[in-house]
Amino acid sequence: MSRRGSFKSSTAACVVFLLGLAGQVEAATCGNTASGFEAWKRDFAEEARGKASAESLAALMATSYSTATISADRGQKSFKLSLDQFLAKRGGPTIVSRGRALKQQNAALFASIEQRYGVPAGPLLAIWGMETGFGAVRGNVNTLSAVATLAYDCRRSAFFTDQLNAALTLVDRGILTSATRGAAHGEVGHTQFLPKSVLNYGTGGSLDSAPNALNATANFLKAHGWQRGAGYQPGEPNFAAIQGWNAATVYQKAIALLGSRIDGQ
């Protein structure tokens, strides 16, 4: 390499380094304890000023560090269970029996969903049952505090920063408020959507309404490649859409198995 080429490379490397450093200076600094959370909120709000509304930034500043969220995030062990153990822990037989009853009781709803999105009742009911026990357990953690805490936490800061930006947009749209409560990671509604999924796949209205949540869930699966009339067991075309719902293999297999039993397959 010539000296000129070497100098160019060195100069380019310095520019890249300085740009990266500038980005680090501007960005709110993550942390793994509560001590830096208030300062992080102020930095985040300052960065977002001009892009987020005063109302949504006020909602952000009203959040508190969620120890319940951090505890839940550090303690996720059920996904390490075998499929049989996981189904026993989640109450698989109850989900199937209740799911079959709800399918019959709401036949018109599920028929309309399948007609629109191509997704049958079984996997939707399996998801609904596993996520919230068919709406019975939707969580009691402040949603904005949960998402802000995980955006601040260093483990998955980038992912949850996206979720926090989506949550602030939902505040502007009147879908979330400072009082909204849900699961420990910021999921809301009957099928536990994170804020970005609410933005991308919500079909209108609150996901605390079961029909709205089920339509949104079917929309999510369709957007992830669900093919009308194709199978959804492992190795079949629609299993990939189920994989988009949850990254844990045991959870994916549970949805497929319970869904097929609810559908009577």
Model-predicted regions and their roles:
Residues A52-Q265:
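Catalytic glycan-binding domains that act on GlcNAc-containing polysaccharides
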